[in-house]
């Protein structure tokens, strides 16, 4: 069953924990439970116990050894940082490498300025060429000024570190961190369906999103997508 994807969703405002198993875009296991709230802290021994029991249940049911999960965080209000970066092309042609470096530079600046934040999604908002908005990056076109607006979705790094402590206790690594709020926004309908949201975000539906991997590494292949279309 190598095609199984495991999703762990933590709803911060609702103090709920859900675990899903997805196979070929189909939800084949779903379990949701309440979490005890110790003040503002919901990630504690209660979570550890529920997580351990859920892991054992899934491993027994599907005869697998569970060691990686997709972590989904559902916030009361989506938290993000918006930023813009420009480059003067001096009436030269726009080239792919310059655009790549431009976006990477903005990403590094935002991360450096916000050390307490863990950025989990990077979304291309708009692209401008000499103040004209474009739906695609016009590679090869002469340009004075090129600019791009980007949204950086984040969760508090302290919360993530606390959560990772309990995951490691259960021999679990994080494959991908997902904003549940953002994942639900990708759906055309039924936006409260957690299972559909989990599936949607793994299918790279939003071509404007930069793929982020653990250890702050960006999948450079995303640039091939932003040159095609903005949605």
Named regions from a protein language model:
Residues 1-15, 23-65, 73-231:
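Nucleotide/phosphate-binding catalytic cleft detector across ATP-hydrolyzing
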